[in-house]
C-alpha cells in the first residue's frame, strides 16, 4: 500500500461491527503498516471504538522475514493466531518459503477438555452410541482444521481423543480387558482417519477467481 491510508466504514448502511471483529492486513513496507494502524485507530475513535491493546501488533512476517531477521541477528519470525490457527513462516520440503497453519494448541486443549467431560456423561452408553457421537465430533473438527500443513495436529487430536475414549471405557469395565490394540480397533471402526480435506489457498483462489 502506498500513498494515504484510507480507512472507511460503511456507516451510511448502518453496518455494526461486533467487539470481536478480527482483521489481518499485510504490507510490504513497515511505514505503510504503521500509517495504516494510526489511521485505523483514529477512525475507530470517531465511533468510540478501540483496538484491543493486547491483540493488536505489527510483526515481521512473510517470504523474506526469516532472512532479514537473521541478518540483524534476530531469531525466527514471530507467529500469529487467527481464526483458530497459528500462522507460521515455514519452509517446504524443497526449502522454499511456505505459509504454514496449525491448530492453536490452546484451542485443541480446550476442545479435548470438553470432549473428556462429555465422555464422562456418556460413560455408560453403548460403544456404538459413543462411537457415532465421537465420529460427528472428529468429522466436524477435521472439516474445519484439515488444511495443508496441519496434518500433525490432526493426528495428535485423533490420538488424544482415542486415549480419552480408552480411559473412559476402562473406568466402567475391567481395566485389563481394554488394551491399546483393542481401542485402536474400535477407533478405526468409528473414527475417520486424519487427512487433509482442503486445497492449498492458491488453488482455491484460482477456482473462485480464474484468470
Q: What are these language model-derived features?
A:
Residues 1-211:
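Non-catalytic terminal/accessory segments
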Amino acid at each position: 500500500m502506498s500513498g494515504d491510508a484510507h480507512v472507511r466504514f460503511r456507516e451510511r448502511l448502518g453496518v455494526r461491527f461486533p467487539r470481536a471483529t478480527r482483521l489481518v492486513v499485510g504490507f510490504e513496507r513497515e511505514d505503510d503498516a504503521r500509517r495504516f494502524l494510526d489511521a485505523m485507530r483514529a477512525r475507530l475513535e470517531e465511533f468510540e471504538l478501540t483496538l484491543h491493546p493486547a491483540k493488536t501488533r505489527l510483526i515481521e512476517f512473510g517470504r523474506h522475514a526469516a532472512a532479514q531477521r537473521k541478518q540483524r541477528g534476530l531469531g525466527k519470525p514471530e507467529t500469529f493466531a487467527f481464526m483458530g490457527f497459528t500462522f507460521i513462516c515455514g519452509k517446504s520440503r524443497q526449502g522454499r518459503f511456505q505459509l504454514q497453519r496449525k491448530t492453536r494448541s490452546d484451542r485443541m486443549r480446550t476442545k479435548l477438555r470438553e470432549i473428556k467431560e462429555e465422555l464422562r456423561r456418556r460413560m455408560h452408553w453403548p460403544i456404538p452410541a459413543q462411537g457415532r457421537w465421537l465420529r460427528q465430533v472428529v468429522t466436524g473438527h477435521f472439516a474445519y482444521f484439515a488444511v495443508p500443513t496441519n496434518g500433525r495436529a490432526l493426528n495428535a487430536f485423533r490420538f488424544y481423543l482415542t486415549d480419552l475414549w480408552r480411559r473412559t471405557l476402562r473406568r466402567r469395565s475391567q481395566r485389563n480387558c481394554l488394551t491399546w490394540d483393542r481401542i485402536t480397533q474400535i477407533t478405526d471402526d468409528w473414527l475417520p482417519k486424519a487427512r487433509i480435506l482442503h486445497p492449498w489457498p492458491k488453488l482455491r483462489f484460482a477456482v473462485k477467481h480464474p484468470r
